[in-house]
Design a protein with these regions (language model features):
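N-terminal Rossmann NAD(P)H-binding glycine-rich loop of SDR-like oxidoreductase domains
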Residues: 1-10
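NAD(P)H-binding glycine-rich loop region in Rossmannoid oxidoreductase-like domains
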Residues: 20-81
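Conserved catalytic-site region of short-chain dehydrogenase/reductase
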Residues: 60, 94-99, 144-148
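A conserved pocket-lining segment of Rossmann-fold NAD(P)-dependent short-chain dehydrogenase/reductase
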Residues: 153-167
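Conserved Rossmann-fold NAD(P)-dependent oxidoreductase catalytic core, especially the SDR/UDP-sugar
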Residues: 11-13, 19, 73-116, 121, ...
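Conserved beta-loop-beta element that borders a ligand/cofactor-binding pocket
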Residues: 126-147
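The conserved SAM/SAH-binding core of class I Rossmann-like methyltransferase domains
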Residues: 15, 54, 139
Length: 167
């Protein structure tokens, strides 16, 4: 997400617990902030046009479910406190429907190592749907995203999982 924003010429402020992990580049400002703290989020994003959140505490995090919900909630609260109106949240494919009334995260084949994070992302989506003071968008990337050459094409769906070969 960061790379795409920079390549498209956006000025980006990245919030990081460890700013030293980022390489200095044009258009990128790295701010030390803990996204679990709404006040720190608010201070970091105040004056921005929009916030793009790709928060995930890490798939290997033992308490990913609770941390994901705490962090996503603090981000929403911080964005609102800062007076930023636009929030784009990068979620996951788990909340997409694969059949009427069946979301991907609820299928038997959903990988166990991603289940708690996907359940938390779905809960975060449920929470943000009740938000009436922000202009928000929840983005669900593909279920499987692998490196490769840009095709210059993409497909948009709504709440259903898109698979290769479907038009």
């Amino acid at each position: 997400v960061l790379e795409e924003l920079l390549q498209r010429g956006h000025a980006v402020t990245a919030l990081a617990r460890n700013p030293g992990k980022y390489v200095a580049r044009p258009g990128l400002a790295v701010v030390h902030a803990d996204v679990l703290d709404a006040a720190q989020v608010a201070a970091a994003v105040r004056g921005h046009d929009a916030v793009v959140s790709a928060y995930n505490p890490g798939w290997g995090e033992a308490d990913i479910h609770a941390l994901f919900l705490r962090g996503s909630g603090a981000i929403v609260d911080g964005v609102k406190a800062a007076g930023v109106q636009r929030l784009l949240v990068v979620g996951g494919a788990g909340s997409l429907y694969v059949a009427p009334g069946v979301q991907l995260v609820d299928t038997a084949g959903f990988p166990a190592e991603y289940k708690q994070g996907a359940l938390a992302a779905r809960e975060a989506l449920t929470r943000i749907r009740t938000e009436s003071t922000l202009e928000w968008t929840f983005l669900s990337p593909p279920a499987l995203l692998v490196p490769g050459a840009r095709s210059g094409r993409y497909r948009l769906g709504s709440e259903e999982l898109l698979m290769d070969g479907e038009r």
